[in-house]
């Protein structure tokens, strides 16, 4: 639908100095933390995806005081020791926490070996992550981790 000369698609974007538009995420993917601030998970997930230890990731944090990354260990790292994987992803979290806004900082990571798929209900037929499914599966644990991380002022990793 066109309103005020704009086509409303549900996408968020940024415009550079030359007038080019870049899609930065979907409005419906944003969530509000306990501080009442909105987090755009897509750019954070994209940066986290640079870590070779993970192949799928989803940032959760609706109503939490810290965000938590849920990540699937990459097939190439499945035989690596867990402590090596944890050290790598927590290093990535620490680096990202240094550049994201304060309310978007992560308190930790939930790691799993089970890939997300259409068959297990986590991906859509177009291979997009169903964020509500991630929240249903990992939300309670993520909420507890967010509280623990905020209280202890440390990064936490858990396996599932």
Regions found by a protein language model. Give the residues of each.
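Short clusters of hydrophobic/aromatic residues that line enzyme substrate/ligand-binding pockets
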Residues: 1-2, 31
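Conserved ATP-binding loop and adjacent catalytic segment of the adenylate-forming AMP-binding
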Residues: 3-6, 150
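Active-site metal-binding loops of divalent metal-dependent hydrolases
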Residues: 5, 11-12
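Ser/Thr-glycine-rich phosphate-binding loops at phosphate-binding pockets of nucleotides
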Residues: 9, 33-34, 124-126
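AMP-binding/adenylate-forming catalytic core of the ANL superfamily
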Residues: 12-104, 115
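Conserved C-terminal "lid"/linker of ANL adenylate-forming enzymes
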Residues: 56, 95-160
């Amino acid at each position: 639908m066109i309103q005020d000369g704009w086509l409303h698609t549900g996408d968020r974007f940024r415009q550079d100095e030359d007038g080019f538009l870049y899609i930065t995420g979907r409005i419906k993917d944003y969530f509000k933390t306990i501080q009442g601030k909105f987090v755009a998970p897509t750019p954070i997930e994209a940066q986290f995806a640079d870590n070779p230890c993970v192949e799928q990731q989803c940032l959760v944090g609706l109503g939490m005081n810290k965000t938590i990354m849920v990540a699937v260990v990459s097939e190439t790292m499945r035989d690596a020791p867990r402590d090596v994987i944890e050290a790598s992803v927590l290093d990535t979290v620490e680096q990202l926490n240094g550049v994201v806004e304060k309310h978007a900082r992560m308190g930790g990571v939930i790691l799993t070996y089970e890939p997300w798929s259409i068959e297990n209900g986590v991906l859509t037929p177009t291979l997009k992550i169903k964020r509500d499914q991630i929240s249903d599966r990992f939300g309670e644990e993520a909420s507890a981790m967010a509280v623990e991380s905020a209280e202890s002022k440390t990064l936490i990793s858990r396996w599932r």
